[in-house]
Amino acid sequence: MKMMSTRALALGAAAVLAFAAATAQAQRCGEQGSNMECPNNLCCSQYGYCGMGGDYCGKGCQNGACWTSKRCGSQAGGATCTNNQCCSQYGYCGFGAEYCGAGCQGGPCRADIKCGSQAGGKLCPNNLCCSQWGFCGLGSEFCGGGCQSGACSTDKPCGKDAGGRVCTNNYCCSKWGSCGIGPGYCGAGCQSGGCDGVFAEAITANSTLLQE
């Protein structure tokens, strides 16, 4: 009886995990998902799916850590930023001092969070980028050249063709050797990270990596 009970619990737990993974993979957003936003600054692709990497954050990205900063504020007819991002004094959406500091027009204005090699290798929370100067944020100043981790605007090489390099933030290394989150990265052929399509752990981890 005890063995059957243990087996039933194990099967139940497996079913819950499978359901969570399927839910994460199928998460819809943007115009195709009732204008929902993705959690933890994951990008909403042009096709309305949440993830991270070029397929999600590149061309057509609707919200989240898109590689092209959205316009906002007085320079964009009073438009506001999605994902609770700051609108800088120059009318661009993002996170960090350049966006949330002096002249910030809207959003959670706050101080910088340190990260990267300048902070003992700490990662930023919620998929924020760690700039070359060691501060967390979103936008070209953080996710562009020299970006150390997070939603960097260039897919970082990984896997067997990159000397066995693993992705930061527990992102998946796809079969093509690039880092990201989503079925195309964590599914068939995934080399490391939250593989086998179960990338919900990677999403959750990024919400608790570093607290202010």
From Swiss-Prot:
This protein's UniProt keywords: Chitin-binding, Disulfide bond, Lectin, Pyrrolidone carboxylic acid, Repeat, Signal
Signal peptide (residue range): 1-26
UniProt propeptide residues: 198-212
Annotated positions of the Pyrrolidone carboxylic acid modification: 27
UniProt-listed InterPro entries: Chitin-bd_1, Chitin-binding_1_CS, Endochitinase-like_sf
SUPFAM superfamilies to which the protein is assigned, alphabetical: Plant lectins/antimicrobial peptides
Pfam families (UniProt xref): Chitin_bind_1
UniProt cross-references to SMART domains, sorted A to Z: ChtBD1 (SM00270)
Binding site for substrate: 36-38, 88-99, 140-141
Disulfide bonds: 29-44, 38-50, 43-57, 61-66, 72-87, 81-93, 86-100, 104-109, 115-130, 124-136, 129-143, 147-152, 158-173, 167-179, 172-186, 190-195
GO MF terms, alphabetically ordered: carbohydrate binding; chitin binding
Highest taxon in the source lineage: Eukaryota
Limits of the Chitin-binding type-1 domain: 27-68, 69-111, 112-154, 155-197
Key word Ribonucleoprotein present: no
Additional remarks: The 4 sites proposed for binding to carbohydrates (N-acetyl-D-glucosamine) of receptor molecules are on the surface of the agglutinin molecule.
Subunit structure of this chain's protein: Homodimer, u-shaped.
Reported function: N-acetyl-D-glucosamine / N-acetyl-D-neuraminic acid binding lectin.
Protein name: Agglutinin isolectin 1
